[in-house]
């Protein structure tokens, strides 16, 4: 009977990653596509870096003149009685000094019994630009709330874009969302630079954040879905490093331009050139998404273009690649997707558990950064440069740290370490602030900023790896929207003029400790295939600590057992 009766087990369906290798799509063509997906991240970073500078409050100085009875240039409130000679002299002395306070209520430098500057404000002293939106419309003192409102609306624009553009990315494709939002970023940015009122600027900045979020989400999905398991981390970190480079580039552009309107046009108008991405065969749709959506002909075309880019000009594809493309539906079979109702999605409890944990972790990682480094934390130019370079530098170091450790120790372990370091830094600053010298406080602040940056990057990557392709746009959009909402901690703190900062830090530190416990419930995705459908995503779970692993399937009974002579 021997080998002639041995049963050949039919090979299972190929995964998408194996299909890429079989077709020959991994190589130069894939790297070109990944590079095209990373380039828009530069302009997303430029847009993010612009808001702190455009809304940076300059040191205030009221122009004063010699007109009685107010020799200081400040106006008395209506309910004030007369001004004595001593009061007028005191007011003139106070106003003659250059005020360095940036308190939006102006209470830090207004003379006694005076609250309005009769003449123009002097906004000299900005670290980078000669003037910004604050100086354009005198958004100080009683109008200072408009600056905080603009910051909140810009962040809400990003959160709304991540949240609401995920569904179109799943329904109509990643490429269409990227092209549409990139094409609208240029006109929106130029329109914001030409706005004639602060209200128009706020509305267009909200829309700009909405569009930039769509770009960021779309290209993140396209980069991730084109990689095999060994490439995903490197590609994700490459996109983050491009974003860090965008922050450094923005400082250079701001030093050159000096005018905030010209700078706004400079960082948004070039996005119109991305319309060339619509050229057929240049910027390709995600082949993984096309297969899941059962658009087989389009998927064959995309894979063929990627494979042909890796071959010398004129050389035909191999026979194995041709057969795999022609029989794509049977080579890589995936269930056809359908429209999912919210009620049906509630049945997949493990997917929701992963979303809840990673969304909460991403929110805390972004919210707690303000406790280590306020945006534009100092009033002097040197303080602003230090804060900006510190934020960008720690983000770059976080990328290097993740690139060295994550593939060796796993996503979940390094995420747990990052949140642990974040909690340690917060507890040290909260409990030992009065006992630490300046060097120790700076060290713990840098540690907290570095670890929170690493936790935010890794939680986004881990979320993209556990969410199925069928709902990856919506799921990842939710995670990134929660991260954007975490950035509201800074404007919220400035809205209350610093009151309650200690309590806010205590709450966020406690939430960081809660994240440490919840991260242990996440699955490990290192070198694993991406889930394609909801059933695959439901299987992404951490093995139970109490349940023993199933024994290896081993047949201990020989096929041709010899009888025992003793019987």
UniProtKB/Swiss-Prot annotation:
TM segment ranges: 147-167, 176-196, 201-221, 235-255, 266-286, 350-369, 384-404, 413-433, 444-464, 475-495, 502-522
Record SUPFAM superfamilies: MFS general substrate transporter
Keywords for the protein's UniProt record, in alphabetical order: Cell membrane, Glycoprotein, Ion transport, Iron, Iron transport, Membrane, Receptor, Transmembrane, Transmembrane helix, Transport, Vacuole
Molecular functions per Gene Ontology: transmembrane signaling receptor activity; transmembrane transporter activity
Glycosylation site positions: 70, 79
Family indicated by similarity: Belongs to the major facilitator (TC 2.A.1) superfamily. Organic cation transporter (TC 2.A.1.19) family.
Positions of the UniProt region annotated as Disordered: 545-567
Recorded superkingdom: Eukaryota
CDD domains: MFS_SLC22A17
Biological-process GO terms, alphabetical: siderophore transport
Membrane-topology annotation of the record: Multi-pass membrane protein
Protein name: Solute carrier family 22 member 17
GO CC annotation, single: plasma membrane
Pfam families: Sugar_tr (PF00083)
PROSITE patterns: MFS, SUGAR_TRANSPORT_1
Functional summary from the UniProt entry: Cell surface receptor for LCN2 (24p3) that plays a key role in iron homeostasis and transport. Able to bind iron-bound LCN2 (holo-24p3), followed by internalization of holo-24p3 and release of iron, thereby increasing intracellular iron concentration and leading to inhibition of apoptosis. Also binds iron-free LCN2 (apo-24p3), followed by internalization of apo-24p3 and its association with an intracellular siderophore, leading to iron chelation and iron transfer to the extracellular medium, thereby reducing intracellular iron concentration and resulting in apoptosis.
Subcellular compartments: Cell membrane; Vacuole membrane
């Amino acid at each position: 009977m021997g080998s002639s009766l041995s049963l050949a087990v039919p090979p299972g369906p190929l995964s998408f990653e194996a299909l890429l290798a079989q077709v020959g799509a991994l190589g130069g063509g894939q790297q070109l596509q990944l590079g095209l997906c990373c380039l828009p991240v530069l302009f997303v970073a430029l847009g993010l870096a612009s808001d702190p500078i455009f809304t940076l409050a300059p040191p205030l100085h009221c122009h004063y003149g010699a007109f009685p009875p107010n020799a200081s240039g400040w106006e008395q409130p209506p309910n004030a009685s007369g001004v004595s000679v001593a009061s007028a002299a005191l007011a003139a002395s106070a106003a003659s000094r250059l005020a360095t306070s940036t308190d939006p209520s102006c209470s830090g430098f207004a003379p006694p019994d005076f609250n309005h500057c009769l003449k123009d404000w002097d906004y000299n002293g900005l670290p980078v630009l000669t003037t910004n939106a604050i100086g354009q419309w005198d958004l100080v003192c009683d109008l200072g709330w408009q600056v905080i409102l603009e910051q909140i609306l810009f962040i809400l624009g990003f959160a709304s874009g991540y949240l609401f553009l995920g569904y179109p990315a799943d329904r109509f494709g990643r490429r269409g969302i990227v092209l549409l939002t990139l094409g609208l970023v240029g006109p929106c940015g130029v329109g914001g630079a030409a706005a004639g009122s602060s209200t128009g600027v706020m509305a267009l900045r909200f829309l700009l954040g909405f569009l930039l979020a769509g770009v960021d989400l779309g290209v993140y999905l396209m980069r991730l879905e084109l990689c095999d398991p060994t490439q995903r981390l490197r590609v994700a970190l490459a996109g983050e490093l491009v974003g860090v480079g965008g922050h450094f580039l923005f400082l250079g552009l701001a030093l050159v331009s000096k005018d905030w309107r010209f700078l706004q046009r400079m960082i948004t108008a070039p996005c119109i050139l991305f319309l060339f991405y619509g050229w057929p065969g240049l910027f390709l749709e995600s082949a993984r998404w096309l297969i899941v959506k059962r658009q087989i002909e389009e998927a064959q075309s995309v894979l063929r273009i990627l494979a042909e880019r890796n071959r010398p000009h004129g050389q035909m594809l191999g026979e194995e690649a041709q057969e795999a493309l022609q029989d794509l539906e049977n080579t890589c079979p995936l269930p056809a997707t359908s429209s999912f109702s919210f009620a049906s999605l509630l049945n997949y409890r493990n997917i929701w558990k992963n979303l809840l944990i990673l969304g909460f972790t991403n929110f805390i990682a972004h919210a707690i950064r303000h406790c280590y480094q306020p945006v534009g934390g100092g009033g002097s130019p040197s303080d602003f440069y230090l804060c900006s370079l510190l934020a960008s530098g720690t983000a770059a170091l976080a990328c290097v740290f993740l690139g060295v450790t994550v593939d060796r120790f796993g996503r979940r372990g390094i995420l747990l370490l990052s949140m642990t370091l974040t909690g340690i830094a917060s507890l040290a600053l909260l409990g030992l602030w009065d006992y630490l010298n300046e060097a120790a406080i700076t060290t713990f602040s840098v540690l907290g900023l570095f670890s929170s940056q690493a936790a935010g990057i890794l939680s986004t990557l881990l979320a993209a790896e556990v969410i199925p392709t069928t709902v990856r746009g919506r799921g990842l959009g939710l995670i990134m929207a929660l991260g954007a909402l975490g950035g509201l901690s800074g404007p919220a703190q400035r809205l209350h003029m610093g009151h309650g900062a200690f309590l806010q830090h205590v709450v966020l530190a406690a939430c960081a400790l809660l994240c440490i416990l919840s991260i242990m419930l996440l699955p490990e995705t290192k070198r694993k295939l991406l889930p394609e459908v909801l059933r695959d995503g439901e299987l992404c779970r951490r093995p139970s600590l109490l349940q023993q692993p199933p024994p290896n399937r081993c047949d201990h009974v020989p096929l041709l057992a010899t009888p025992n002579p003793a019987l």
